[in-house]
Amino acid sequence: MRSYERSKAAYEEAVTLMPGGVNSPVRAFKSVGMTPIFMARGQGAKIYDIDGNEYIDYVLSWGPLILGHADPQVVEALKRVAEQGTSFGAPTLLENELAKLVIERVPSVEIVRMVNSGTEATMSALRLARGYTKRNKIIKFEGSYHGHGDSLLIKAGSGVATLGLPDSPGVPQSVAQHTITVPYNDLDSVRYAFERFGEDIAAVIVEPVAGNMGVVPPVPGFLEGLRDVTKQYGALLIFDEVMTGFRVDYHCAQGYYGVEPDLTCLGKVIGGGLPVGAYGGKAEIMEQVAPSGPVYQAGTLSGNPLAMTAGYETLRQLTPETYKEFRRKAARLEEGLHQAAEKYEIPHTINRAGSMIGFFFTNEPVINYETAKTSDLELFAAYYREMANEGIFLPPSQFEGLFLSTAHSDEDIEYTIAAAERVFARLRG
């Protein structure tokens, strides 16, 4: 058993300083029954906690670190740029360079606006969609997280296409009533919502691969159907690619699945581990954003040199071959975990999209939030604790996916599979 004494002491202090001792709720490790593990450093695919324990990391700061920790080229570029100034509140050439890479690689993006987080990106995209269409309502999908903007913190009602109720205190009902929540991968529900409210629906916002109910890819025809119905009713289609952007494919999920939205939200990978977000799309729509148009959005640190540098240096190193390697390694990890679980009769379903993997403790196919919730959460928590003791750092939530980086070696994958087999044996012992 590993010692976490220093992490425990650090957490005892942290709870006196921050709500719940953390700056983002899932980091509290509540769903897995552990004290949060405090990290000290990372290198490549490995991270090290303040007690000196080493882990193979499949969290990667919740996705951004596609090159692994402390990539030498990213670090060197950040040092060079930081010495020249960390922020100016004025344009820099670095913004141009990252914007050009994004526009070159994301099929639907003709113009892009940089912001500071994924939440800013989705909030801004929704404001733009409402301003452009002059409509109020949006459709989102049950179990999909698009940041903590008021319009998006909504849970589904009990019926199909039910108007949302606030999912957090502090979200006014007057805001929630404009959000329609339907099941993911359920095109009929979307069509029904449009039949009822179509003239007032500004946009559908969707993760092309759902990443906050585990990893749930779209069923065949789902994204294409969303594209068709939004065009039919004059609404915008927004892809939230904060998680999938440059993770699923060189051209993002929209390139992989061959469906182009009107607006795209990005984050995570395009900041290389620094705070960043972006939203972009067709020029006709994006030109409505101030100062070109009347839809206002601004940010003190938007496009800051450090985030632009980390993002540029990260994207510059990614090639189409990178994603072939990701698919090979992810397929091997999926296969190995499946074989280990089968051997010990562990109920499981594994979903995969690019370098994202979702492991669910259920035999039911996981295609939406309801089926994701059939996973055995107690078994997941036990699995999580045992894997941590084996030196595998996983997301401390059943409803988050695993991420691979270019730094993960074949040896890392094989060790992870062997560790899972040992854990499954103990869980069934």
Curated annotation (Swiss-Prot):
What GO CC terms are in its UniProt record? cytoplasm
MF terms from GO for this chain are: glutamate-1-semialdehyde 2,1-aminomutase activity; pyridoxal phosphate binding; transaminase activity
Cross-referenced PROSITE patterns, in alphabetical order? AA_TRANSFER_CLASS_3
Per UniProt, the keywords (alphabetical) are: Cytoplasm, Isomerase, Porphyrin biosynthesis, Pyridoxal phosphate
Write down the EC number: 5.4.3.8
| CDD domains per record | OAT_like
Q: Tell me the cofactors it needs.
A: pyridoxal 5'-phosphate
Q: Name its cellular compartments.
A: Cytoplasm
Is Metal-binding set as a keyword in this record? no
Which parts of the sequence carry N6-(pyridoxal phosphate)lysine?
268
Family of this protein: Belongs to the class-III pyridoxal-phosphate-dependent aminotransferase family. HemL subfamily.
> What is this protein's name?
Glutamate-1-semialdehyde 2,1-aminomutase 2
